[in-house]
From Swiss-Prot:
Name of the protein: S-adenosylmethionine synthase
CDD domains membership: S-AdoMet_synt
Organism the protein comes from: Bacillus licheniformis (strain ATCC 14580 / DSM 13 / JCM 2505 / CCUG 7422 / NBRC 12200 / NCIMB 9375 / NCTC 10341 / NRRL NRS-1264 / Gibson 46)
Taxonomy, superkingdom: Bacteria
Protein family membership: Belongs to the AdoMet synthase family.
Region annotated Flexible loop, chain positions: 101-111
Keyword Nucleotide-binding: yes
Binding positions for L-methionine per the UniProt entry: E58, Q101, D253, K284
Xref: SUPFAM superfamilies: S-adenosylmethionine synthetase (SSF55973)
Length: 400
């Protein structure tokens, strides 16, 4: 490898990974609540281990949701349907411990600082403050048609395919837990040129040989997903490199909501503010502002204003206006970063209620994002993935 070239690696996990089970349960509960009460406040955390699910958090709503039923349906859909897996939708225990949102937090969200001080009327959308302080990042680049970094894009596609061949019984001996990882080589111009390494670990039936798993996964998972032009004779494959992966899922490792935040976003290619997404309604800026930051970054790249763009937003609890907006185009910008911030402020309402309105976030759309990434999802119609602002941004930034 030339000294001016570099390697970058990202990973993904399947929907049967213990942490991802938790993300999907938390977002399933959120969606069930939002179907009946779009204004509910939800912060739902899930933990799983052998034979046990614990759902906890703060939920303020006018509706009733059968949480154990929602939990079991989600686990069944993922594929944990047999007691010998050590975790089974029918027989696992489901414990719940739910409180209401703290009134101190609710006060800040219900009516933003600016509205409480009389600067805005109660009727305006600015009357919702941020549910917490924090910083969030959004990113986009032109490496793929979905404007995502190539390593995480391929890792997600491999994980999705791993689940497809299991559920469609193309490889019926597979079990739900699995992980993928892709290492991409970049040239001196930071363009992806080849795949250096592919790693796949998949849970399986105990009677299947490692050789069969390796052969089947190359044929049915890797070859249909990975572009042939990026593979060469030096590409390395590590398929179940420990040799055996029978005990998996919550029996193998305990899982928690919010422990796959890099898988959920950009695979480490961009910075992360630390806040998780799943189980949180849109008044939580950890989620909604991260979606908005992606929306901004993607439209900047789609407009041709940069090849690569990272957007940072930051908030104070109870305050509607972001305390800061920062944009980094890594030397690829066609306009100055000051100009980009100016046109972003003009074209995007980045106050929490503005984000909710702009992206229509009070809908039950979250469970589908809880596995295989929240961004770059060509299989879903997610509002923060639209590029409907690109033309206006280009016009405002370049005067075209």
């Amino acid at each position: 490898m030339s000294k001016n070239r570099r390697l970058f690696t990202s990973e993904s996990v399947t929907e049967g990974h213990p942490d991802k089970i938790c993300d999907q349960i938390s977002d399933s509960i959120l969606d069930e609540i939002l179907k009946k009460d779009p204004n509910a406040r939800v912060a739902c955390e899930t933990s799983v281990t052998t034979g046990l699910v614990l759902v906890s958090g703060e939920i303020t709503t006018s509706t009733y949701v059968d949480i154990p039923k929602t939990v079991r349906e989600t686990i069944k859909e993922i594929g944990y349907t047999r007691a010998k897996y050590g975790f089974d939708a029918e027989t696992c225990a489901v414990l719940t411990s739910i409180d209401e949102q703290s009134p101190d937090i609710a006060m800040g969200v219900d009516q933003a600082l600016e509205a409480r001080e009389g600067a805005m009327s109660d009727a305006e959308i600015e009357a919702i403050g941020a549910g917490d302080q924090g910083l969030m990042f959004g990113f986009a680049c032109n490496e793929t048609k979905e404007l995502m970094p190539l390593p995480i894009s391929l890792a997600h596609k491999l994980s999705r395919r791993l689940t497809e061949v299991r559920k469609e019984e193309i490889l019926p001996y597979l079990r739900p837990d699995g992980k993928t990882q892709v290492t991409v080589e970049y040239d001196e111009n930071n363009k992806p040129i080849r795949i250096d390494t592919i790693v796949i670990s998949t849970q399986h039936h105990p009677e299947i040989s490692l050789e069969q798993i390796q052969r089947n996964l190359k044929e049915h998972v890797i070859n249909p997903v990975v572009p042939k032009e990026l593979i060469d004779e030096n590409t390395k494959y590590f398929i179940n490199p420990t040799g055996r992966f029978v005990i998996g899922g919550p029996q193998g490792d305990a899982g928690l909501t919010g422990r796959k935040i890099i898988v959920d976003t950009y695979g480490g290619y961009a910075r992360h503010g630390g806040g998780a997404f799943s189980g949180k309604d849109a008044t939580k800026v950890d989620r909604s502002a991260a979606y908005a930051a992606r929306y901004v970054a993607k439209n900047i790249v789609a407009a041709g204003l940069a090849d690569s763009c990272e957007v940072q937003l930051a908030y104070a609890i109870g305050v509607a206006q972001p305390v800061s907006i920062s944009i980094d185009t890594f030397g690829t910008g066609k306009a100055s970063e000051e100009t980009l911030i100016e046109v972003v402020r003009k074209n995007f309402d980045l106050r929490p209620a503005g984000i909710i309105k702009m992206l229509d976030l009070r809908r039950p759309i979250y469970k589908q994002t809880a596995a295989y990434g929240h961004f770059g999802r060509l299989d879903l119609d997610l509002p923060w993935e639209r590029t409907d602002k690109a033309d206006q941004l280009k016009k405002d930034a370049l005067g075209e």
